Amino acid sequence: MKNNQFGRIRLDRTTELEELKNIHFIDADLLADPKAQLKDFLKRSCLVSNSEATFQQKLSNLLATPDQTMAAFFESDQPLTLEIFILLELQLLQFEADTDYQIEDPLSAISKIQLPELDLKNFETSADVAHAWYNLLTTHTKNGEVYLDRLTQQGYFVSFYPTTTKPLFFNGKAQAVFDPHQLIREVVYVEAPLDTDHDGQRDLLKAEILRPAQTAHGYQAPVLYTASPYNQGTNDSYGEAITHNVDVPLTEKAVQKISKSDVTAEPFSQTLPAERKVAGMATKASETFAREQPYTLNNYFLSRGFAVVYAAGIGTRDSDGLRDTGSVEETISTTAIIEWLAGNRRAFTNKTDNLEIKASWSNHKIAMTGRSYLGTLATAAATTGVEGLETIISEAAISSWYDYYRDGGLVAAPDTFQGEDMDVLAAEVLSRKHDAGDYLGIKAHFDQILKRIEKDQDRDSGNYSKYWDSKNYLNNVKNIKADIIMVHGLNDWNVKPRNVGKLWNAVRDLPINKKIILHQGQHIYINAFRSIDFTDMMNLWLSYKLFDVQNGANEVLPNVIIQDNVEPETWNTYQDWQAADDEIREFTLQAKTLVDRASETKNEAASFRDSLDPEFFEMYKNDLKHWHTDLLNTEHATNGKNQMRNNRLIFKTAQTKEDWLIDGTPEVSVNVAVNQPFGMLSFQLVDFGDAKRLNPSPSILQPRSLSGSFDWRTDDLREFTLQNAVTPWKMISKGHINLQNRTNNYCVDEVKPHQFYDVKLELQPTFYRLLAGHQLGLVIYATDFETTIRGNQELLYSLQLNQSHLKIKLAH
């Protein structure tokens, strides 16, 4: 395995000693003898030992040298050496002898596993031992947590619980000294400046709060806030019932010559009813809850002095209002919670008594967390500049809803959600439907909203419009004041990388701190990965942003961290992603090949069709993996004859002589004609070459092994591992375009049958290492069974190859 720690800070020895005292590894002074000091550290960390005999038994299970136990070592006159300490460290960190390290040569494992190096050669004093112990406590175990967190799970900080009144920090990070079993759980109803259900009253929004017991006695906690429309339940069958049929034909669109101003959303306005009249003040909530739908990263911080708030927003169970995916109202309902937490909005104990309750326990510093829709709402909130929001950690977040459900003038579904759209998602998260009595009063109005969304989303055209512009958070990035950490999968075909790519470019020059972490996963969380200290980094960051701990987090954490797609457990740092100084490589299409654009080319043409026999159309529709295999397979050996052989064109470079680090947005330009007055093209950039690649999904290494607190909620330890079998290809990026949207996503151009047009588009941004000896391929086709509508029409496409090109950028 490889250890990658970015959230670990280096401190001077004086500070290390003070911090060791703060967490009770040292009482007043160090012991005189280095060996005695090490034994004392071990005894304090042996949490299962209640007697000297038990402790000696544990020491007998540890080796000091290849032929001596730690118990025997402490009885001997042998001095403590670096080799002895490192061998002990490797055992305490759960590494396995003969697998991860050699007992005879423990020092070589430090560089092999990428553990922090210890700047000692000899242990001359107990201060040297303390320095080494501090180093050990802040080093990751084999199982995805620093050693101090491992001790924490075993109960190290339980004795701190009765006397804890404020956070405790070690190595710049908050520690688990708050008893998570004594959390205060309460519900409040925040009055939002909205009336989306038009009942003549401002919408009340349910918020579920978990906060340390100490907040009842004057301690003020920072808040991790997760806005999750799924939090109060979903209507899966309802959404499935109104999912759109995608087996429909592509049609000709009326020519439309308009400007950007014609598709710019009108400023939001509304008429609001008056605020509720306050009938009195309350200091305690009148409602509680048993168990929320948690995010495991939030769970980790509940024992570290943070409060956590979950709110589902308008139209969800126990809240007022109605859902409208991506709307301004949805953003306002998100920021209303922040405003209450920051002391700038009212909330009530319930929906009838009008008893106001304040967040007196909050320190008015809020961070937002969450993935997908949750991270999307964090992004939306940040673009308002709302007071109190200090930072967001947005994972797999949408930055423009058009880029989620559309691409290049086409309906383009998120991965595995063919037929979903803005209306379907709104229906799925209208959890007020779960309460029949509540739903009775809003059903008719919500039906009207769904009809309006269906009309405005305009699946018939796929064009960008005022509707989509009102759901484009990129329009408001200038308002962002909160610092941002973005996390996204380079293989996320649900919320595609364009969303984070555009946001990263948009905030690059803003006067805020911004970081980005790109992993090789799909639509996933990465906080429980073994090879990267994501949770530690977020602890360092949140301690800095919400507790104002001067730990240098902004300088310590790299601006760009990207997981390698070739070597497992490898994460590299960069100054930028989609960097301006990347090297440009351009290729021209020739018969089945991609050649350097500067080389001499021939006037060649190639064509492909888009129709399939009904039998094979149904086969591919019901077996997308089979379709994708046949699309990329040039051997024509999948289940006999490859039915896609005439439905796509594949162009490959020569085998590369060196590794290429493809960075940013590949660009394709083709000279194309079609036999109808309409058409579409799809493209995939592909790595062709035999290799054992990373599995698409992370493997569970140890189930329920991580919690970060004693006797607390657990998470599975995960990691990307190599596939057992060699595979011949890997898709790097993809893109789609309607031939009538050659100018942009909102202008509609004429397409005359059999007339050639220049069509340009950008594929999804990426960061990909193409190994030496592999070939870079461009696959051109029309219907994408995973993404586009599937009309199975008699369309024939022709390309002028020497007028068609691919441009990529290579990182230095």
UniProtKB/Swiss-Prot annotation:
Biological process according to GO: proteolysis
Location in or out of the cell: Cytoplasm
Catalytic activity as recorded in UniProt: Hydrolyzes Xaa-Pro-|- bonds to release unblocked, N-terminal dipeptides from substrates including Ala-Pro-|-p-nitroanilide and (sequentially) Tyr-Pro-|-Phe-Pro-|-Gly-Pro-|-Ile
Chief site of localization: cytoplasm
Active-site residues per Swiss-Prot or TrEMBL entry: 372, 492, 523
Enzyme Commission number, as recorded: 3.4.14.11
Pfam families given in the database record: Peptidase_S15 (PF02129), PepX_C (PF08530), PepX_N (PF09168)
Annotated Gene3D superfamilies: 1.10.246.70, alpha/beta hydrolase, Galactose-binding domain-like
Keyword Acetylation: no
Annotated keywords: Aminopeptidase, Cytoplasm, Hydrolase, Protease, Serine protease
Single GO MF descriptor: serine-type peptidase activity
Keyword Nucleus: no
GO cellular component: cytoplasm
Subunit structure: Homodimer.
Role of this protein: Removes N-terminal dipeptides sequentially from polypeptides having unsubstituted N-termini provided that the penultimate residue is proline.
HAMAP family, alphabetized: Aminopeptidase_S15
Family of the protein in this entry: Belongs to the peptidase S15 family.
NCBIfam families: PRK05371.1-2 (NF003781)
The name this protein goes by in its record: Xaa-Pro dipeptidyl-peptidase
Gene, per the UniProt record: pepX
